[in-house]
Amino acid sequence: MPLLQPSTCFCYPLKLPPLPLTSDSNEFDECARKRLTLDYRTGSAVTLTRSNIFVHGGLTIPLNLPVVNSMQLQKELILFFAKEKNNGSSFRNLNEWISKETFFLDLMSRTWYRVKTSFDQRTEELLKAESSSAKADNDTNEIRTDIKKGKSLESPLKERLFHSLCYLDGCLYIFGGLTVSPQSGYELIATNELWKLDLNTKKWSLLSDDPQIARRFNHTMHVKNENNDNRDTKLIIVGGLNNMDQPVKKIDIYNISQNCWQSETIPKQPMEITTNVNGIPLALSKDQNFSILVENNEANVPALAFYMRSDQIDEYLGKDSSKIKENSPIVALPLLSESQGIRMPSNPALPKKLLNVPYELLAPTGDYFGFNIIIGGFHPNYQSSNFHCFIYDINSGKWSRVATACPDCDINKHRFWRVFVWKSHHQTILLGTKTDDYYSPSVQRFDHLSTFGLPLVNIFNKTIQLPHHKISASSLPIPIENFAKHKDTPLKKVSFTSSATSQFENYIRYIAPPLEMSSIQSVFPPYAMVLGKDALEIYGKPLSDFEFITSEGDSIGIPCYLLRKRWGRYFDMLLSQSYTKVCADYETTDTQSTLIKFSPHSSRNSSKAVRQEGRLSSSGSLDNYFEKNFPIFARTSVSEAQNTQPQVANADAKAPNTPSTSDEPSSSSSSDLYSTPHYQRNNDEEDDEDPVSPKPVSKSNSIYRPIRKTESSSTTSSSNGMIFRVPFKEKAAVTSNTEALLESNLSLQELSRRRSSLMSIPSGELLRSSISEAEHQRRASHPLTSSPLFEDSGTPCGKQLQQLQQHTIQNPHNHLSPRRFSRSARSSISYVSSSSDRRGNSISSRSTSDSFGTPPVLGVLNVPLPPQTREPNEPPPPCPAMSTGSNTRRSNTLTDYMHSNKASPFSSRRSSHIGRRSSTPETENAFSATPRASLDGQMLGKSLKEGSTSQYTQPRMNSFPKANETIQTPTSSNNEWSRQSVTSNTDSFDSLQSNFALELEPLLTPRSLYMPWPTSTVRAFAEFFYTGQVNSKWLLAPVALDLLVMAKIYEIPLLYKLILEVLYSILAKKEESLSLICTSLMETFRTKTLNSYKGDEEKTNTYLTSNDNYQELLKLKVSLENIDNGYYDPDLLRKQSRAQSSSTQESSGSANGEKTATGAGSLETSSTNVPTVFAGGPRDSHNSVGSIGFPNSMNIQGSRRSTSGFSPRVKMKSSLSKEIDPKTFYEEYEPKEGKSFDDNDDQQTNIGSFNLHLFDMNYGSISSSSTNSISSSDLEEKEEQEQLQDLLEIEREDSAEILDARFRNKEDDKVTKDISNDKKRNYLPHEKNNLKAKEGKETRDVREEEEEFDFGLGMLSLNKIKREAKHVDKVDDSVDPLFKSSAFPQSPIRAYGSTTRTSSASGKPFRDNRSFNAFSVLTLENMASANALPPVDYVIKSIYRTTVLVNDIRLMVRCMDCIELSKNLRALKKKTMEDISKLKGISKPSP
């Protein structure tokens, strides 16, 4: 079998729910223990909603069921109890072995919890009343009577298995299933009861037990119109078996809005729908088929899509299943009365051996995402190694296989049994067990999951169907008016707000038009995106209380609350670090402000007995913080349900991955505290663990409290009310009103139980060390370096931003003159408007106007200023030796990082801080060795190193430790099992369960964050938090490519996946164009050959078989098919490996003087080339926030002067702007015959920045290091110009033929006749000479192309960037019709063209002019929309270089394959043209 492309899977262990705490540990027998835990289940109902997976019911014993029916189940039960001697002897009733418990998995914390439920009082009374007058012949009443005879506290909800479960608006619904017969304790019967569990009240209620509805089990249930308020919401019940094990083919529909079955609705709208294909009924069962409900399809008619093995469908249809399968196993069934199912098309181009597997999957499961169906199953048997995952593209019928191997699969053999699609996070989840237990998929395990991202689905969207099959991509839901096309059910009564709603819908379409660049819907619904855009563009300034400072010195405002909510833990870390430092400085100076009520000593002394023992939750939010600490301002939410037992919540809240003194929380606390984190608050953005996910449209009234109250709680000071706009004190150390914040007395035992995730520690805990016993030993001018959270960073931001390099080694006292730096250079978080500079030293001369542009008002506020501190006069201590381990910021090499699990987008907060080593000043050891001051050592699991050096002398060049060298401590191990969440961008304000109020003092809260990126990129970064989507107007470069790196470094997995989705779309267009060109070229070659041989098929086939070029085209086409099917192409991979190996051997003499890559992603980089973001920021400041989150294994300390690859446009503030000035660039390469550019301010960002940034702008290093000077030397410039000139001469002489070939199609004979006899006679010898000349240059040419891949972190010379920017179209014009507007009249690129092509004979002026104008508008819309043209090769190379930085192996390989195929096709096209010319010569003399 071919080798699959790289897997993007990562596995995570799940913490199973513990037994409830009881006074008697022996109270639970074996049956009860199994019911209350999730070790094994058979026939439980499982569903995923939002960020939770719910499980209900099921047998608690593992049963291998080849087929699910009541007879087989009874047989397996008898065999099981016969084998189990102990169980067999003690067996009394089958109910003991069936669970009725409800569990849910919090995907963010990866922890299972049990929901403690009760029974609805009204329903219970109704049941008792009915039971008292029950008739003997009524089965349901018999069941109720039996229940009445039992325990009074027992819920009437019977234990069941093989039932269905779904979620809607904060409620769980279950239907049907098998229950134990009341007549016998071992017989199972089907039921038709429909139950509802309200997750707000945790009470069950019986909705229906209508005897007219068929009893069934082993079926599925779907929710229809969940997000449409204008239509009734319904439950669609599909498939299953009845009591006689006969299939139920009728689809039952329950109308939730009217609380009745569809046959009883008013007005009557019966719907008779049966599962069928072409009118022939089909039997669906959950164990052999799966079904999904697709509402947003092209026809605007909700339809079921179900999977059934192709041979089974053929049996129903009476076809011979031995024949080659031409239809996929996917059947679409519209939900209309008497509708007929249709088999979905399948791509016939796939070979039969690849179709056997997806057509014959066993135990299939799946879901849909965008216009793709993700399917998982087993073939040919149930062995765990035979689990396969496929993506079926609805548009093209394409099947593509996805690798599911994870980094841990070599150690543990996993068994997965269920596939989920986590749509809000664009991920697929595989649920199963870590170690293969050799059970069949009918045995359900819940201790392990694996995830892989879904943006890759866009790469499979090859448009093979006819035009009428094409589905237009839209981010908008189905227009309401389109629902009237089918008479499913009447629309609800029009309300008085319908006109306003209609106007708002029109406004939505105007403000947030449908995106054409993606087949996947946006994260947020349209109205949410509109609100976000309005907040950004209209109310951005009034709402903003925080700002991003860009590398160009611009300020971009954004609300701090929004960042905490949607950026999450990473931002919390930055904020807490800086806030802690400010508070510590305020305390150190011992100067009290009239605006700040802060008494750390008294509050500390009075808090010893107040703080209750608390444990950290796995997730949290600002909402939960308000709910617990400020209930007056809180929203009605889950916490109100928890307030009934606040002491339980505080005592039993537990970190999911942290051992504690009490191993298991009580059932009441676990259920009350964790059972409803997301779904109780139905119609607001409350999803703590899901910061940017779509919210279901609620059908109830709003449960918000007045929003102004919520604002007041977060924006008011403890003294003078709302003072967000008040600038901060500059000299006086400042802090928050932490009287309540400090009311915690953490014991060492308590600390030892805390997890070491950075984001789980609120600033209240961070401040503990700043008030330690040794606080009076600090010098007033000495920065706080023992903050418990940031031992490795020294100061909250100033030291944190020194992760990789420090500029103080060249000027140890430059902190005394902060004016030497520009505003943006000093605008890192906490030091824009705090009491110290970026180095952490106090400054009295700087005012707030530096960061806000407003006049200082400190005098007006009468804030007392302390006396200026003395300048330090002691000399800096000497630099430590290179081998000193304690000063190594990161412990692993780049190569180690590239192959580490921590490189994944799902990497949690902790993984990016494991294994770090810090530079801790000697003064720190004096007090951080004390028990209270060593909070960091206990929380972060780091041990202080002796002999560490002063903060002023950390060397810029750190040693390179051995690969995989890490710091192993009891609480910090370099493995993946300690991760806190699947995705790490979780807001974490609720990470400390306690009863003391924690309020940030607005005067002390940092308000600016320096980001070493261009303004356009940072603006887009901020826009994402407002809208939750990718803007189609963003430039591919620098914005989109920068955002990919930012999302990885700053840990925003959703943004990472959205950008990847766009990049995959661009790559898919390139591959599709290569496939079309290859097919067209082969058909043209065959047609011309057939014509030359007068239609003789035999001679034609013989000639083509012996023609090397045609055979190469065949191989290239096969390669494209293999890659598109999800497999490696062995030949292509072998060629690339050889090329990379030869390049590696020659790398010592390469132009850029760096070690080169070997293989896909095997990077080793020289220490001389460090991109700015790694080095810590532009302008050699090395203190930027860009270096904060880069993975800990990247120990790439470099030379003293940094490269500027990550901040290419710095307004005359670095050497880079002198080397690359946009105006200079235009002047040198401005088209002579075209329209010149205007250098106004508007074009400076949009058009002007393009030439600087399009291809390598972020990563094309223009190094000022002496070791890199060779790459921009005059010698290389001259050599490159000579090579380029030779290449252009060859290209120019053949330009007419090449351009004509681009317009050629297989029916076009006129183009072939254009090659005259003279041209033919001169062409071959001349081409021969040209080819000889090319061979002379081929070595250097190949070397150039190799160097474009063999680089350290994407660094190319300036010459190469200029050359490619100017001449890329000439290199690619034989295969890339990027500027051929005449052939694509619908292309959006035409709108930006300033010239039109008037002559086809000479295309050079046209292409030159078009290139600059077209490139300058390379927005995502123009690159990835449905009408976009294929990108040129250099765009793919740029994506590849960016992908190397983020270590996305799969995309890396696809880009390399695509570029290699494009290069091969370009060469083959020229050779094929030569062969066609020869054929003309053969056919001419023939009679």
Swiss-Prot record:
The keyword DNA damage does not apply. GO terms for molecular function: peroxidase activity. Residues 658-677, 824-847, 1138-1150, 1263-1273 have a biased composition (Low complexity). GO terms for biological process: cell redox homeostasis; meiotic cell cycle; negative regulation of ascospore formation; pseudohyphal growth; sporulation resulting in formation of a cellular spore; TOR signaling. The modification Phosphothreonine is found at T785, T930. GO terms for cellular component: cytoplasm; cytosol; mitochondrion. Kelch repeats lie at residues 171-226, 234-287, 371-419. Residues 1274-1283 have a biased composition (Acidic residues). Keywords: Cytoplasm, Kelch repeat, Meiosis, Phosphoprotein, Repeat, Sporulation. The modification Phosphoserine is found at residues 472, 475, 621, 639, 693, 698, 744, 747, 756-757, 781, 787, 900, 904, 1187. Residues 639-720, 772-796, 810-986, 1134-1169, 1189-1214, 1263-1283, 1308-1341 are annotated as: Disordered. It is found in: Cytoplasm. Residues 639-648, 883-895, 946-957, 965-986, 1189-1206 have a biased composition (Polar residues). InterPro entries: Beta-prop_ATRN-MKLN-like, Kelch-typ_b-propeller. Residues 864-880 have a biased composition (Pro residues). Its main location: cytoplasm. Negatively regulates early sporulation-specific genes. Seems to exert its function by positively regulating the Ras/cAMP pathway. Required for growth under alkaline conditions. Acts synergetically with PMD1. Present with 396 molecules/cell in log phase SD medium. This is Negative regulator of sporulation MDS3. The lineage of its organism: Eukaryota, Fungi, Dikarya, Ascomycota, Saccharomycotina. The gene is MDS3.
